[in-house]
């Protein structure tokens, strides 16, 4: 995947690489289930922690490649929340932005948390709490994995969820 377009002054890309149809799909309200090949598929609800360059890129990839991801994963994936301290007026995902991790942790629909904040804190605390709540976590945060990977893998195992990292 290659991103096109340019970032704004905060390093945010928005939906620079999407075509108009992908934008319409991303903004459409979904009932949480869809029919494909005669089978009902449950919508997997995800949250992204951080909406900088990496987090906005994750949101963009999930939005622009929605159908391909659903086909490969077996279920469609929808970003329900984006955790960030900032607001993003005019962004296609502005209504998904929340400022309190508790919103994500307390929502039983959220099954996947994508940690894109980087660094040790609050990434460690938020990842740990998500795993304790039974939510799978994925990250590319090498510092977090190096410092706490064994503990987070153990927590995932104990809570019957997954901890994915690259």
Feature map (PLM): residue ranges:
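N-terminal glycine-/serine-/threonine-rich beta1-alpha1-beta2 phosphate-ribose binding loop
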Residues: 32, 37-132
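General beta-strand structural signal in soluble alpha/beta enzymes
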Residues: 97-98, 114-115, 138-140, 163-166
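Rossmann-fold NAD(P)-binding glycine/threonine-rich loop
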Residues: 123-133, 140-166
